[in-house]
């Protein structure tokens, strides 16, 4: 089997309004545009549950209308463990109901006004480990894989954070989503991280990084240095090669938090790059 190419469509929804009908219209537009560009698989944030919770079949039918598969929903955990687990289980249930297979998740941030990058805080990471272990086990009963995403500005970001989290989570239930841009911001070679985590990788996020802009950025501005594929310095052919070495045949999901022109234009640039540089 070959790797599958996906795109995140939450960026359509944050510009289209959060009232239910506007959100649904934006989601449908993302399906239509991404299918036109050649993306057969789609990811979104778990907040879309708010608009379809009473009728998941409506979202199943929308996927069929455009012949796309919404394979992943993305959740965020703060440090209230019981609340995070309760919310996570509801999101996993909804994901399973619409046919999704992967549940991406991350810490939602430190919850204070302190710096965005900090030494490993074992107390904070332990909370993420406990939440992930419980939800990962639950997800398996629903046919879903939990994939934790190390992310800038959170308690699981650096190499030390990742090592601690990996050592304290169940490898049979808790997997990883490696993000090529966030690892680059952490000073981690994404190729090396792929090889390190190996079979624990169940999902991939592809983003490029403009390191010149990064050198001029501080704090949260660093995430404004992400680019469409091919417009930065990430060696995606090497990333693909490392994934092939570990036998990965899952999803390569392109994400761009802040498109320069529009979601469609950025998605088109990345899709052309994937075809030309990666042969997918």
List each language-model region with its residue ranges.
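Flexible glycine/acidic-rich beta-alpha junction loops that bind and position SAM and/or redox cofactors
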Residues: 15-18, 107-115, 185, 209-221, ...
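A short acidic, glycine-rich active-site loop
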Residues: 19-20, 121-128, 224-233
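Acidic-and-aromatic substrate-binding clefts and catalytic sites of carbohydrate-active enzymes
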Residues: 14, 21-23, 44-56, 77-86, ...
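Acidic/histidine-rich catalytic cores of soluble enzymes
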Residues: 41-42, 71, 133-233, 279
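Aromatic/hydrophobic pocket-lining residues that form the small-molecule binding cavity
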Residues: 27, 56, 84-91, 125-132, ...
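N-terminal pre-domain/capping segments
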Residues: 1-102, 122, 133, 140, ...
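Active-site groove signature of glycoside hydrolases
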Residues: 99-118, 142-151, 253-254
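Residues at the N-termini of beta-strands
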Residues: 41, 102, 203, 250-251
């Amino acid at each position: 089997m070959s790797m599958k190419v996906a795109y995140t469509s939450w960026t359509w929804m944050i510009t289209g309004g959060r009232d239910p009908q506007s959100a649904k219209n934006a989601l449908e537009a993302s399906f239509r545009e991404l299918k036109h560009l050649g993306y057969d698989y789609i990811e979104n944030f778990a907040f879309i549950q708010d608009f379809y919770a009473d009728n998941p079949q409506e979202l199943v039918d929308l996927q069929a209308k455009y012949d796309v598969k919404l394979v992943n929903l993305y959740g965020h955990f703060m440090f209230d463990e019981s609340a995070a687990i309760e919310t996570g289980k509801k999101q996993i249930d909804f994901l399973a109901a619409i046919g999704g297979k992967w549940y991406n998740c991350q810490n939602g941030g430190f919850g204070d006004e302190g710096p965005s990058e900090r030494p490993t805080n074992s107390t904070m990471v332990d909370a993420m480990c406990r939440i992930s272990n419980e939800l990962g086990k639950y997800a398996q009963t629903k046919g879903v894989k939990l994939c934790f995403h190390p992310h800038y500005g959170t308690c699981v970001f650096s190499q030390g954070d990742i090592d601690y989290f990996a050592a304290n989570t169940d490898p049979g239930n808790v997997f990883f989503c490696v993000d090529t841009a966030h690892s680059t911001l952490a000073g981690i070679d994404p190729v090396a991280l792929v090889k390190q985590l190996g079979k624990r990788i169940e999902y991939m996020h592809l983003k490029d990084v403009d390191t010149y802009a990064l050198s001029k950025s501080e704090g949260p501005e660093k995430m404004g240095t992400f680019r469409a594929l091919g417009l930065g310095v990430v060696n995606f052919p090497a990333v693909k090669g490392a994934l092939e070495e570990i036998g990965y045949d899952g999803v390569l999901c392109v994400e761009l938090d802040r498109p320069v022109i529009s979601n469609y234009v950025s998605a088109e640039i990345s899709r052309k790059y994937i075809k030309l540089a990666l042969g997918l």
